[in-house]
Structure formats: C-alpha cells, structure tokens
C-alpha cells in the first residue's frame, strides 16, 4: 500500500485525491493547504488527516508526496520532500525559472528519491497506442506532427500570476508529447502568440492563444 501526503487541495489536488482514493494500492493519509477549509473539505471527501506541510515531511509513515500547490512553491517542496525520504509526483512545471528548476534537479540528486512530473498524457491509452504504432513503423515514418489543444476557459488571473501561464503551465503538455512521441528535444522553436480573449491576460504579459513550430 502506497501512502500519500497531498500538498495543495485546489482543483487539481481534488483530481489527484479522487484518483488516489480509487486505486486499491494507494491511500491518502495527509492533506495540507494554505486554505484550511479546502484541505478540510478534501479530507472529508477522500480521506486523510489535515495537517501542515512540515508535518507531511516528518511523517515517516508517508511514502510519497503529491505536489498540487501553486507553481511558485514546487521546487522548494520537491527539495524538502525528497530530503525527508519521500518519493514525489509534482504537477508541472517544476518552477517558472529554468535556472531554479535545474538547481532543484541538482539539489535533489543526492537524496536518491524518485521524482516524476504530472505529464499524464504519456499514460493516456490513445497516446500510448500512437507511440506503439510509431515505434513499430505501423503508420510509416513520422515527418510532421500537428497538436491542437484547447482549454474550456482561461484560468483565473490570480492563478496565472504564479502558474507560468500559457507556455509553462498549459502548452507544456503539448511540448512533452512531441518529446515523448519523437524521443528527443527540438533543435529550434518559433512561436506566434497573442491575447485575444481577455485583456487582463495581456496586462500580465501573458497570452491566451499561440502557435508554436518545433523543429
């Protein structure tokens, strides 16, 4: 039985809590959130004891930490959780800053704990089947991949301020699919982006619509 401590009881935290509760070999034992009411409601719905983040680190009965808090907290939580001997599944991205993300990777290597990012599409049966067909040559040689993604609505502005925005929080899934299917990193990238839905997004220096070409 894998015991899990969940940090972050917002929308995606509830999705993860539901998944943990449905799996026969995992159990949610602790929940922490800066908004205690959110943590209390999640614990009431899916189990687990409401506690602090530090209490999750110190709890020796917890095998893994699932990080579903805001992006600006990810790298520090990853470092502290692995130092405490916990495996980590973290929502993407590791950090808004590439420098800080790389630093986090280096800082956690000595801790020897597995770390995984929430690139769930790699486990989607449709993408897995496509990957298998590509590897087997069943659909010929791949020369061009077109990915079109939509969100039902832009995220709240408060979330955009700390999430990483369109590229680091949302399109990151599409970039990862290119890496997954083609087994490599792009040599170059060109992007055309704009903000046409909500001018508040533009005021943040972010975008709601973009086309990216990776080579």
Language model features with spans:
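Short, Asp-centered acidic motifs that coordinate Mg2+ and/or phosphate
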Residues: 30, 64, 144
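Glycine-rich, N-terminal phosphate-binding loop of Rossmann-like dinucleotide-binding domains
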Residues: 68-69, 149
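Beta-strand-loop-alpha-helix segment that lines the small-molecule cofactor/substrate pocket
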Residues: 63-64, 70-71, 75-119
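Short acidic low-complexity segments
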Residues: 49-60
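NAD(P)-dependent dehydrogenases' Rossmann-like dinucleotide-binding region
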Residues: 12, 118-122, 134-156, 170-174, ...
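Rossmann-like dinucleotide-binding domain that binds NAD(P)(H)
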Residues: 155-215
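Basic phosphate/pyrophosphate-binding loop/patch that engages nucleotide-derived ligands
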Residues: 106-114, 128-142
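N-terminal Rossmann-like dinucleotide-binding module
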Residues: 1-46
